[in-house]
Each structure stands twice: as structure tokens, then as C-alpha cells.
Amino acid sequence: MTLDVDAQKKDEKLLLSTIQQEYKILAEYKMIESEKVSGIYVIPSYANSLQWFGVFFGRQGFYENSVFRFSILLPDGFPDDKAVPAIIFQHNVVHPLVCPYTNSLDISHAFPEWRCGEDHLWQVLKYIQAIFADPLDSIRSVANIQELSNPEASKLLNTNRDAYAALVQESIVESKSRVYDTPPTEDPHYIVFEKFQANVHGPVLDQIRKSRNTIVPAESGVGGAATGLSWVKVKEGDFKPLSIE
């Protein structure tokens, strides 16, 4: 009987701990929404809140017009654990801080350890923005380039910008060519892109045009129709426009 009671208490404690962790993770997601981090979209997995799906859209510099999928893997003890989240890109990304073998991003230069209550996931997303906006600045404080995840990329960035830019473009082209690939998971929260379909996306596009005409009347009739909309579907029948290329 005593063993049964102890086991029950242990289960209740584990359940309470799990619920508390879920609330903390939800709070992290809400903070991301309130911070309005632009150019990056993330959502926790439906099946496992410790795994997040994300997409980065480059808007300037070497990585302009890039679309990189990535995952955020939170430690089992997040956010109380000092271990930092893991950021892993789905495909090859050329950057001094991204390992060419594992596609993992080294965030230890900004987050040597996770400080519960001080460090937050929206800050990690801001860091991702920063390292792509200015890759050279992101490694400026590193004295030994051999300590970087991709020292060869670092060397090119410092000595041959054209060659570096060419490699980056190759990775961008490859990544964008696989945007519409079949999802590797059946998780309903996986971010799915779909090609423009007039019967599905047309009404939403019309609403966007009308909204723009209402908000900025001076721009009506200028430049013709918008093209190249990127769309994301986070669940069946729910489409959201992300950007105009």
C-alpha cells in the first residue's frame, strides 16, 4: 500500500511539473507574439512542445530573399535547465556559425548558458535575425576562427566576399527549391507552403488589395497587381500571406 501511495505521489508531482513547464513554454510563445519578431515564423509542435517548427525569411545583405526552415529543440528541463535550445536548419545553410555537417546553429556566443527568467526564445530569434543581417559582425568577437562551426565560410567571408556570396546563393536556391516538398512529419503544426491557387488564395489577395487601397489611398493605381505572394498553411483550410517577393 505504501508503495502504491508513493508511486501515486510521484506521478502527481510529475504531472504538476509537466503542466508548469507547458505554461512556461506557452508564455515564451506569447512573448514572441508581443515582441513582433519580423521575418521569422515559429510554432510549437502539436505533438511535443519541446520541438518547434520555424521559417526564416532573409530581407537584406547576403541572405536577401532566402527562405530557411529550421527546428528549435528545447532541453527536457526547459526553461530551468542551463542547457541552451538547439537550432537546426532543415537544409544546408552557409554561415560561419552553422555546422555544414549537422546544420546546427551555434548560439553559445550569445547564450553560453540558459538563464531562466532572463533569457527568452524571442531573444534567440532576434539573434538569428542579427547573424544573417550581418554575418561578419556576428563573428567579430571570435579570436580563433577554428572555434567556429564553419571556419571555411568564415575565411571566405573575410577574404573573398564574392565567393562567399556565391556559396550563400547556392544554399538559398536549394532551400527555396524545396519549400513545397512533402512535409517530413504529419504534425498538424508543421508550417506548410502551397503554391498560389486562384480559387483558394484569390479572395484573400483581394482583401489585402482592398485593405491597402483603404489605408493608403494615394497608392491606388500605382505599380499594378502584386505578385509573388508567399503563403503558409498552419492547419487545414487556414492560409496566411507571409510576404511579397
UniProtKB/Swiss-Prot annotation:
CDD domains: UEV_AKTIP (cd23814). InterPro entries: UBQ-conjugat_E2_core, UBQ-conjugating_enzyme/RWD. It holds the Pfam family UQ_con. Residues 20-177 form the UBC core domain. Belongs to the ubiquitin-conjugating enzyme family. FTS subfamily. This is Protein crossbronx. It comes from Drosophila virilis (Fruit fly).
